[in-house]
From Swiss-Prot:
GO-annotated molecular function: 3-oxoacyl-[acyl-carrier-protein] synthase activity; beta-ketoacyl-acyl-carrier-protein synthase III activity
Lineage: Bacteria, Pseudomonadati, Pseudomonadota, Alphaproteobacteria, Rickettsiales
Keywords attached to this entry: Acyltransferase, Cytoplasm, Fatty acid biosynthesis, Fatty acid metabolism, Lipid biosynthesis, Lipid metabolism, Multifunctional enzyme, Transferase
Catalytic activity, EC: 2.3.1.180
Associated pathway: Lipid metabolism; fatty acid biosynthesis
Catalytic activity: malonyl-[ACP] + acetyl-CoA + H(+) = 3-oxobutanoyl-[ACP] + CO2 + CoA
Name the UniProt record assigns to this protein: Beta-ketoacyl-[acyl-carrier-protein] synthase III
């Protein structure tokens, strides 16, 4: 028994900031950003537009795409590292916005790997036969964590949300397999925020060692994917679309090169979305689905890495 995606939806705030606009108040330029990251623009939420609002917009699109009633949902999981409040959870607020009562809802925090983590958790819950329809969301207001004086990080991130509706599969479609990992030994030497509720009462700002993260991303995502391929007796040629975490075009291209995944199979949205953390994969999936390219039976590969470090991959048959 496994879960399948029956609907998806993405939402990006209306405000778009190009590299040239960013260069007006940050010591950077369009060429510097594009050549190092592949990013040309990012969407930025307004001051009163919170993660829960982004989540709601994407959830409504996913519900409509799935053709279900909101009342069919019996569990909500929101993957985020930028909640509106310390508590309640974004998922709880979203449940209220949707008018749902007496169903469980919770947030899952695995940063950029959140959606892959959430997919495995949701699949386990559907496989338990306790839940039939799960709303799984990746939603982030990453710009709230940026130090706009640090050009090595502030140029990388954007805001947005992506949602999927999951139900039990009655055929061979759905989640084929997934793996998730973490390693917290050297978190403060790679990627973290310099604050937190129990540390100093503030959320802090993103601190990142880019070269170290690049090396870890290539090594760990590549091994995660190879493990899945081996475990399921798949070859790279079986993959129809590769949807990696949209962190940096160099990471995406290097992974595709090392794994011998053909260029036309690699989904890239980092140029327009920037790094939306847990929202990046479901946003990219929604973009791909809207293009009309996916057909039934296609094999999709998701893979992500985030702070922690957390990482993992998943195979889905559409």
């Amino acid at each position: 028994m496994t879960c399948k995606i029956i609907g998806c939806g993405g939402y990006l705030p209306s405000k778009i900031v190009s590299n040239d606009e960013l260069a007006k108040f940050v010591d950077t330029n369009d060429e510097w950003i594009r050549t190092r990251t592949g990013i040309t623009q990012r969407h930025i939420a307004g001051d009163t537009e919170y993660t829960s609002h982004l989540a709601l917009k994407s959830a409504e699109k996913a519900i409509a795409d799935a053709g279900i009633s909101v009342n069919d949902i019996d569990l909500i999981i929101t993957c985020t590292t930028t909640p509106d409040n310390s508590f309640p959870s974004v998922a709880s607020k979203l449940q209220g916005y949707l008018g749902l009562t007496n169903i469980p809802s919770f947030d899952l925090q695995a940063v950029c790997a959140g959606f892959v983590y959430g997919l495995q958790v949701a699949n386990s819950l559907i496989s338990s036969d306790k839940y039939k329809t799960i709303l799984l969301i990746g939603a982030e207001k990453m710009t709230s964590l940026l130090d706009w004086n640090d050009r090595t990080t502030c140029v990388l991130f954007g805001d947005g949300a992506g949602s999927v509706i999951l139900q039990r599969s009655s055929d061979d479609s759905g989640l084929i397999d997934s793996n998730i990992f973490s390693s917290g030994a050297d978190y403060d030497e790679i990627l973290y925020t310099n604050g937190g509720v129990s540390m100093n009462g503030i959320s802090g700002k993103i601190v990142m060692q880019g070269q170290k993260l690049f090396r870890h991303a290539i090594e760990k995502m590549q091994q995660s994917i190879k493990d899945l391929l081996h475990a399921n007796q798949f070859s790279v040629s079986d993959i129809d679309y590769f949807i990696p975490h949209q962190a940096n075009i160099r990471i995406i291209n290097k992974l595709a090169e090392l794994l011998n995944i053909e260029e036309h199979k690699v989904v890239k949205t980092v140029d327009k979305h920037a790094n939306c953390s847990a929202a990046s994969i479901p946003l990219a999936l929604s973009t791909l689905k809207a293009s009309g390219k996916i057909k039934k039976g296609d094999i999709l590969l998701f893979s992500a890495i985030g702070a922690g470090l957390t990482w993992g991959s998943a195979f889905i048959r559409w």
